[in-house]
Amino acid sequence: VTQDYSQPIISDELGSNSPHAAAERNCFARGVHTPALFEIDGNPIPALVADFGSPLFVFSEHTLRSKARHAREAFRRRYPKTSFAWSFKTNHLQSVCQILRQEGWIAEVVSDFEYEKARYLGFAGPDIVFNGPYKPRAILRRAIDEGALLHIDNWDELSLIEELTRDRREPLDVGIRVWLDAGIRPVWSKFGFALANGEAERAAERIVKNPRLRLHTLHTHIGTYILEPSAYRTATQKLLALRDTIQRKHGHLLDCLDLGGGFPSNSLLHGMAGPAEQVVPPIEAYADAITDVLNRLPEKKRPLLRLETGRHLVDEAGYLLTSVVAVKGIHRQRAENDGLSARDFKEQLIAGEDS
């Protein structure tokens, strides 16, 4: 008798399926000592709080640009045909988006608000990747008219796009979102057409046969804060296999593979089983996993690789400045701050005595 195998995960006694849950009681999970910080990009922290109050979010332009350039170099040195899209859902602050636009990123959006924000900030329609499980008719019509790249998520959306493009003279470039198992648990199941049951191939066939649409991209998004680079290798292999099937059956070679995001940062997550510097692989490990597969292809068959980076770029650039408003002696000395509603932040002594 056989049964489907499901990879085990660490779980606590309450039955949580979070891989980080058991780390709550791990003596290494509380992070490591960090020195006092007195300024951010040359701006004294007391002056920032005096000018803007607290709690206050501050982002380092220097760190953001450095992370972007490091990621770009890691991938393009291995695979020059790499394009990057900034995940607006991760952070849609105007300055953050503009900095990444200056660094050569296009926009990746998942809602009408994000699409309109990207256009307002100067991203042209063809420089916008439109993901998301739901795209209202009005914004879909606008995105089609402006030439955005639509990643189709479901059959209903495909039918709506077919309706909206019925009178087009030139085919519209589109992509399909592919749900696949890359070997990590839990498996995300909220995006796209399933690969294993042939749904993704059927969606591709329907698009290829429509003269008003042109299948440009295969897209997948396997999760967030992925600590196993090998999962991206598996995802790349599976998308390439689907691409080969489409070419073999329909004579159409797709231009682009979009591996989505999910790349972790070195910011410490609540309950992480060890310091981030020891747990999180370098971005080069993810670049190796993906590009090793692509570089095995004949040069003429190598697709454009697109990545939708988010937290990997911005996490370490962001700071939440708070002020101590009370000190209590309950059980042990505790300090309360004015950012009590904030969670999953690494506490750090700011503009005070090192301890």
What are the functions of these language-model segments?
Residues V110-F113, N131-K135, P171-A182, L213-T220, ...:
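Non-cysteine beta-strand/loop elements that form the S-adenosyl-L-methionine
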Residues V96-C97, Y120-L121, L140-I144, I161-L164, ...:
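Short acidic, glycine/serine/threonine-rich loops at helix termini
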Residues L14, S230-S355:
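C-terminal active-site-proximal or functional interface alpha/beta core segments in diverse enzymes
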Residues V1-I152, L158-P171, K209-N210, R214, ...:
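A charged N-terminal "starter" segment
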Residues N154-R214:
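Conserved anion-binding
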Residues K67, A118, N131, N197-R214, ...:
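Structured alpha-helical segments in the cores of large, soluble enzyme domains
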Residues H92-V96, E114-E116, P136-I139, W179-F191, ...:
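Conserved radical SAM core fold
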Residues G53-F57, G125-P126, I144-L149, R185-A196, ...:
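Glycine-rich tight-turn/loop motif centered on a GG-T
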